[in-house]
């Protein structure tokens, strides 16, 4: 999917926002189609369960339960959760401390200047988009194998993909901040589970909190107008070399 998006937006220079929305809808349909085919094949009606495989992804450190609340909170997660933190830390280091990362940031800020400096704009855009797509795929794998215990259900992801976009905005495009934002948004998202006696409407209102917080952050960031808190200047825009 990331390769299709890259080809359409980088090579053909189609509008990135429209392409993203179209592929999101397309991806949901493809997932439900193949999921429905597997349901028919296995004779199930609501979900496909891969509990044994899911349990492998949910395996936790054997000594986590012996460390009390700290162990249960931070050391009892599946390995994909820790892998996500490692990926964010490595990404932060690469973007801020390596030549490749600085070149990539230059492409995002001002591709014309980067192109004039000899940076291959197309290569960096393809590489970053494909890596981002792979990381997003790992997020989907985590949801199916760890969060839901290896069970596939049509439309089971709900709005969690949009929650990831909200986290990126809240973290002002900084991978290190995204780690803390993920914990905050995750806590807000499941807050209704730990508040007894809530009506269904109240639960939905609480589930809106991450998005409300994101809007507030956008307002504050736009008012302060600090350069370090702004998104990449060329975010969402196609690069036309002939206009350089």
Label each PLM-derived region with a short phrase:
Residues 109-116, 122-123, 195-244:
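Cytosolic-side transmembrane-helix boundaries in multi-pass membrane proteins
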Residues 3, 7-11, 33-37, 93-97, ...:
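Membrane-interface helix caps of multi-pass small-molecule transporters
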Residues 30-96, 202-206, 232-244:
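Transmembrane helix-bundle core of multi-pass membrane transporters
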Residues 73-151, 175, 180:
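Helix-loop-helix "hairpin" substructures at the membrane interface of multi-pass membrane proteins
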Residues 1-30, 189:
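Alpha-helical transmembrane segments within multi-pass membrane transporters and channels
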Residues 136, 146-211:
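Transmembrane alpha-helical segments in multi-pass inner-membrane proteins
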Residues 28-32, 81-92, 132-140, 164-170, ...:
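Hydrophobic core segments of alpha-helical transmembrane domains in multi-pass membrane transport
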Residues 14-23, 46, 103, 155-157:
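Cytoplasmic-side transmembrane-helix entry/capping segments in multi-pass membrane proteins
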């Amino acid at each position: 999917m990331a390769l299709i998006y890259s080809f359409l937006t980088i090579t053909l220079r189609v509008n990135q926002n429209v392409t993203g929305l179209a592929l999101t809808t397309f991806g949901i349909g493809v997932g439900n189609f193949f999921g429905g085919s597997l349901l028919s094949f296995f004779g199930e009606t609501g979900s496909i369960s891969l509990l044994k495989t899911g349990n492998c992804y949910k395996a936790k450190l054997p000594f986590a339960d012996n460390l009390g609340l700290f162990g249960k909170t931070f050391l009892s997660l599946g390995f994909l959760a820790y892998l996500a933190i490692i990926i964010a830390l490595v990404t932060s280091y690469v973007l801020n401390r390596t030549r490749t990362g600085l070149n990539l940031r230059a492409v995002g800020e001002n591709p014309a200047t980067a192109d004039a400096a000899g940076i291959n704009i197309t290569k960096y855009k393809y590489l970053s988009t494909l890596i981002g797509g792979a990381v997003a795929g790992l997020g989907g794998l985590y949801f199916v194998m760890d969060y839901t215990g290896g069970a596939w259900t049509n439309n089971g992801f709900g709005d969690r993909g949009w929650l990831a976009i909200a986290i990126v905005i809240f973290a002002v495009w900084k991978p290190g901040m995204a780690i803390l934002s993920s914990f905050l948004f995750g806590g807000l998202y499941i807050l209704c589970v730990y508040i007894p006696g809530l009506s269904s409407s109240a639960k939905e209102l609480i589930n809106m909190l991450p998005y409300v917080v994101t809007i507030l952050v956008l307002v504050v960031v736009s008012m302060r107008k600090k350069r370090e808190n702004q998104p990449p200047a060329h975010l969402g825009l196609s690069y036309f070399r002939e206009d350089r």
